[in-house]
């Protein structure tokens, strides 16, 4: 699949997730088979651009793959400026967030709240597309609420504004992450626009990935929560799409290798004072299958030293040897 002049190596994209898709996680997902990874959502508010959090969220020129940054906001001029700043910092694709359902984002008329105001959507998309010379993409939900699904209208508007690809999460804002994602709306959008359409929502395994591609006709898939603690899902899905065969479960020794390497990267990226705190949630996701009683996770989350975290993980996996 192509986005503008960029050719993706496959049709699997790691979704932007606030507090999760930092550089270590993006790099790991790319190594595990994602064709594209997207940064955490960055605010277009210029007052926060120079914060340590924003600097960490920006892409880095030595990252693997096509560097993609997602921005969010409601003011066209600020969104355009944010896009320019990120391109100057190394972004090769700019993604606009109009899908986030979080209240703190929607209260500022950003994220999925914008789906209620097509005229404002048009103003933002036009401003960002004109501001940069790299491809601009858009991520939305199917609408604001089930009774008002307007994703087809927004998709057609996006294409008219010069958006190069569109990701649709198969829920409305009102649905949050409750219930099941629906794919009829994504299928309807695909039939109405010529730009690439990326399906998102509840794509949890290779069989589901194949089914969603076949049903919607989507050009690609975006995978988010299913990759938490399981970044190898991209490799599993791609293998199934290529061969029709399922890979065997990842050996525990490989899970250990990936987890410990990920934790070390988090320690290095965030520093000793913060890295161990960030690592806790990732370790919890990795071990959901192996530590269902939560005892180890509770013990691990009480550790406040990076080296002790790694020692605890080594000891934990030795019990399975």
From Swiss-Prot:
CDD domains attached to this UniProt entry: DUS_like_FMN
EC main group: oxidoreductase
A single GO molecular function term of this UniProt record: tRNA binding
Binding annotation for FMN: 16-18, 70, 139, 200-202, 224-225
InterPro entries: Aldolase_TIM (IPR013785), DUS-like_FMN-bd (IPR035587), DUS_fam (IPR001269), DusB (IPR032887), DusB-like (IPR004652), tRNA-dHydroUridine_Synthase_C (IPR024036), tRNA_hU_synthase_CS (IPR018517)
EC number: 1.3.1.-
Entry keywords, A to Z: Flavoprotein, FMN, NADP, Oxidoreductase, RNA-binding, tRNA processing, tRNA-binding
Active-site residues, Swiss-Prot/TrEMBL: 100 (proton donor)
PROSITE patterns reported in the protein's UniProt record: UPF0034
Catalytic activity line of the entry: a 5,6-dihydrouridine in tRNA + NAD(+) = a uridine in tRNA + NADH + H(+); a 5,6-dihydrouridine in tRNA + NADP(+) = a uridine in tRNA + NADPH + H(+)
Cofactor: FMN
Role noted for this protein: Catalyzes the synthesis of 5,6-dihydrouridine (D), a modified base found in the D-loop of most tRNAs, via the reduction of the C5-C6 double bond in target uridines.
NCBIfam families (alphabetical): nifR3_yhdG (TIGR00737)
Family recorded in the similarity comment: Belongs to the Dus family. DusB subfamily.
Protein name, UniProt field: tRNA-dihydrouridine synthase B
Species: Klebsiella pneumoniae
Gene from which the chain derives: dusB
């Amino acid at each position: 699949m192509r986005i503008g002049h960029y050719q993706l190596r496959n049709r699997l994209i790691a979704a932007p997730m606030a507090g999760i898709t930092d550089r270590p996680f993006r790099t790991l997902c790319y190594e595990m088979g994602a064709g594209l990874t997207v940064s955490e959502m960055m605010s277009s508010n210029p007052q926060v651009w120079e914060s340590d959090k924003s600097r960490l969220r920006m892409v880095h020129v030595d990252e693997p793959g096509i560097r993609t940054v997602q921005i969010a906001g409601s003011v066209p001029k600020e969104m355009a400026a944010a896009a320019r700043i990120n391109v100057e910092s190394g972004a090769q694709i700019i993604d606009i967030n109009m899908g986030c359902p979080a209240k703190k984002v929607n209260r500022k008329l950003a994220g999925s709240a914008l789906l209620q105001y097509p005229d404002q959507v048009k103003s933002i998309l036009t401003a960002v597309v004109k501001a940069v010379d790299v491809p601009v993409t858009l991520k939305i939900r199917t609408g604001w609420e089930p009774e008002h699904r307007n994703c087809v209208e927004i998709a057609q508007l996006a294409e008219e504004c010069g958006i190069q690809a569109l990701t649709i999460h198969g829920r409305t804002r009102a649905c949050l992450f409750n219930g099941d994602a629906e794919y009829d709306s994504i299928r309807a959008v695909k039939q109405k626009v010529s730009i690439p359409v990326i399906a998102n929502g509840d794509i949890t395994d290779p069989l589901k990935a194949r089914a969603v591609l076949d049903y919607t006709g989507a050009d690609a898939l975006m995978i988010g929560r299913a990759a938490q603690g399981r970044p190898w899902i991209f490799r599993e899905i791609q293998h199934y799409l290529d061969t029709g065969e399922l890979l065997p479960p990842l050996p525990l020794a490989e899970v250990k290798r990936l987890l410990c390497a990920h934790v070390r990267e988090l320690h290095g990226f965030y520093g000793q004072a913060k890295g161990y705190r960030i690592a806790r949630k990732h370790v919890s996701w990795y071990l959901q299958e192996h530590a269902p009683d939560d005892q180890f996770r509770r013990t691990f989350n009480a550790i406040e030293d990076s080296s002790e975290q790694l020692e605890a993980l080594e000891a934990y996996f030795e019990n399975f040897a």
